Amino acid sequence: MTQVIQLKRYEFPQLPYKVDALEPYISKDIIDVHYNGHHKGYVNGANSLLDRLEKLIKGDLPQGQYDLQGILRGLTFNINGHKLHAIYWNNMAPAGKGGGKPGGALADLINKQYGSFDRFKQVFSESANSLPGSGWTVLYYDNESGNLQIMTVENHFMNHIAELPVILIVDEFEHAYYLQYKNKRGDYLNAWWNVVNWDDAEKRLQKYLNK
C-alpha cells in the first residue's frame, strides 16, 4: 500500500475589521494593499513552496532540478510573513477601541520592568526607530526569565520568529506606511500607538503565562 504524503496548506485569515477601520492613523489604501496584496502573497508563496516540497519528498522532482536550500529559505520567509502579519492585524483595533494603555498582567509587568508605561513606550519606540531598513519590532514574553523582551528583526527569513511568545508587534516594512507617511517612519510609529489593541496583547500574554 502506497503511503499518502500530504503537507497541510496555509489559509489566508480574515481581517478582523474593515479596511478603513484604522483611519486616520493607518489609511484604507495601506490596509488594502498590505492585507490583500502582501499578506495574501505570503500565504500563496508558502503554499506554492509546500507544493514543491511535497513533490520533492515523493520523488517527483529529479535531483538537480530543485534547490532544497532555496525552498527551505523561501518557506521560512513566507511562513514568518504570514504568521507575523496575522498577529499584527489582531494587535490593532479601530480608532476609539485601540490605543491608550494596557491593563491586567501586562500593565503589571511593564510597570515592574520599566517603572511606567510612558517609559516602556519610549524604549519600544526608540528600538523601532533604530531598526536599519525593513523588519519588525517585537515584544515577547521570555518563558525562562519571566521578562518582557523587546527585539528588532530585520526582514523575516531568519528562523521562525513567529513561533516566539509574541505579545505585541509592529510591521516596519515600507509597505506598512509609505503610501501615507512616505519616508517618515517615526510618524507612522507615533500613529500606530493610537490603534494598539491592548486587549489582544493581554490575551496573548495570559496564554503564555498559563502554559
From Swiss-Prot:
Entry's EC annotation: 1.15.1.1
InterPro entries, alphabetized: Fe/Mn_Superoxide_Dismutase, Mn/Fe_SOD, Mn/Fe_SOD_BS, Mn/Fe_SOD_C, Mn/Fe_SOD_N, Mn/Fe_SOD_N_sf, SOD_C_sf
Superkingdom classification of source: Archaea
Catalytic reaction(s) noted: 2 superoxide + 2 H(+) = H2O2 + O2
Cofactor detail note: Binds 1 Fe cation per subunit.
Assembly description: Homotetramer at high temperature; homodimer at room temperature.
Family stated for the protein in its record: Belongs to the iron/manganese superoxide dismutase family.
Function statement: Destroys superoxide anion radicals which are normally produced within the cells and which are toxic to biological systems.
Protein name, as recorded: Superoxide dismutase [Fe]
Source organism per UniProt: Sulfolobus acidocaldarius (strain ATCC 33909 / DSM 639 / JCM 8929 / NBRC 15157 / NCIMB 11770)
